[in-house]
Design a protein with these regions (language model features):
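Polytopic transmembrane helical bundles with strong interfacial aromatic enrichment
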Residues: 1-479
């Protein structure tokens, strides 16, 4: 297919499915915590705006959560179908870590999700709030285990290799491997920031259409406070993550910087733009700032950054891809910080909700957090190449050995099915977003004499009336 080998098609297939999948957990993590904050504020203040926002976003959360679970199952199967040699080699580490995620996180979420989505007016307020908090904690615990497994593949430790297989010898070292704290923090904050801009974009859309309600204003206000406070923190965390990567994966940093060779003892420049050429072993048309590379990456003007030519050609990541994916991530991060600062300036002037240029920026920034997450994952995963487990197993040795025809057919099927099914799901979720928050009316529906109506499935928490308009009596209730 297009002159690609089976291993390349397997990588493209996994990249496609995981790129689709990560969008949903990122929003799930952020929305779960956002819902917990909204319900907590409602219980404390009794301000109905928080309650109305809770019921509005809980419906969107239900749809997003369902799509995240389904897309995650596909990825799990691929470890066995497409990457069986990797599973055989490292399964003693990755298998238990993913099992811990199911036992501690997924079961916690599943146990309280029903109460959270369908328990309003059926359980006490404190119990319902507790359920929402447990779901939020469950999403973070899930992030913990998934990032631990992935980080171990980046910086493996706490193991022995016996008979060609990884055998864990120190589970604490496995879980808390050198890159794990930085990657966990970076990803969790990224999920919060991505959700903030998703929420802020939704509010901006309604304000631009003249729907200036207290609930919409509160959405925008909370989103911009999050952007203002957390986006700069993400930049600092990213800096520490970069220092950790320089220590443990210097070839990745060299590829990200497009830095091919050091000249004498001269400090490393920072290449702002250019086109890395893997064949010619140089970065063409580069625009650089002298010394700044050393200052940013080593916090010193006396040290140099390792160069790509210091590594064997077969051990070098594809510099062209990670060079630009990293810059997309950083550029979006800077734009997020700018948006947060602009919102503060407008807030002080009293024009946060009426400045159309700002509202248009907030609207278009809606997907920025998700795009930045994808760019960041492309950087870290492609930058790990040619290794699937850094320094231990090459990606070329990890695949199941399927034919080009098999991988081509399944890749095409995945693309078609994903765009149809998840396209429909995303369209439905955007339909809910466009409706906006409405006033919630306390009402307990009944399905028969002495029986309350009970939703039959999680996605039925996202309720719409027949005329494509919300019935306030049904907000937050099931079919």
């Amino acid at each position: 297919m297009f002159g690609l080998e089976a291993i390349e098609l397997a990588r493209i297939q996994f990249a496609f499915t995981i790129s689709f999948h990560i969008l949903f957990p990122a929003i799930t993590i952020g929305l779960a915590s956002y819902l917990a904050v909204l319900e907590g504020l409602w219980l404390k203040t009794r301000d109905d705006v928080y309650r109305d926002l809770y019921h509005f976003w809980s419906k969107i959360f239900a749809v997003n959560f369902g799509m995240g679970v389904v897309s995650g199952l596909v990825m799990a199967y691929q470890f066995g179908t497409n990457w069986s040699r990797f599973s055989d080699f490292a399964g003693a580490v990755t298998g238990p870590l993913l099992t811990y995620e199911v036992l501690t996180a997924f079961f916690l979420e599943a146990g309280f999700l029903g109460v959270m989505l369908f328990g309003w007016n059926r359980v006490g307020r404190n119990l319902h709030f507790f359920s929402t908090v447990m779901v939020a904690i469950g999403t973070l615990i899930s992030t913990f285990w998934i990032l631990s497994s992935n980080s171990w593949m980046q910086t493996p430790q706490g193991f022995e290799i016996i008979d060609g297989r990884v055998i864990p010898t120190d589970w604490f070292a496995v879980v808390f491997n050198p890159s794990f704290p930085y990657r966990l923090t970076h990803m969790a904050i990224a999920a919060f920031v991505a959700t903030a801009f998703f929420v802020g974009s939704s509010a901006a859309w309604h304000l631009l259409r003249g729907r200036d309600t207290p609930a919409v204003r509160k959405m925008l206000s909370m989103a911009m406070w999050m952007a203002l406070l957390v986006a700069p923190v993400q930049a600092v965390v990213g800096d520490f993550h970069g220092l950790n990567t320089l220590k443990h994966q210097p070839a990745k940093i060299a590829a990200i910087e497009g830095h091919w060779e050091n000249i004498g003892d001269e400090p490393t420049p920072l290449i702002l733009f250019g086109i890395p050429d893997m064949k010619e072993e140089r970065t063409k048309y580069k625009v650089e700032i002298p010394y700044l590379g050393s200052l940013i990456l080593t916090h010193s003007l006396d040290k140099q950054v390792p160069a790509l030519k210091e590594f064997k050609p077969e051990d070098r990541p594809n510099s062209l891809i990670v060079f630009w994916s990293f810059r997309v991530m950083v550029a979006l991060g800077m734009l997020m910080i700018f948006t947060g600062l602009w919102s503060l300036w407008l807030r002080k002037r009293g024009t946060l909700y009426s400045s159309r240029p700002f509202l248009y920026l907030a609207l278009w920034m809606g997907p920025s957090g998700l795009v930045a997450i994808l760019a960041g994952w492309f950087t870290t995963e492609i930058g790990r190449q040619p290794w699937v487990v850094y320094g231990l197993m090459r990606t070329a040795d990890a695949s199941s050995g399927h034919s080009v025809a098999q991988m081509s057919i399944t890749l095409v099927l995945f693309v078609v099915v994903y765009f149809v099914l998840f396209g429909a799901g995303l369209g439905y979720m955007m339909r809910l977003v466009r409706k906006g928050p409405k006033a919630y009316v306390e009402h307990v529906p009944h399905g028969g004499p002495g029986q309350q109506r009970t939703p039959a499935r999680p996605l039925s928490a996202a309720v719409e009336s027949e005329d494509d308009g919300d019935n306030p009596d049904r907000l937050g209730k099931g079919n």
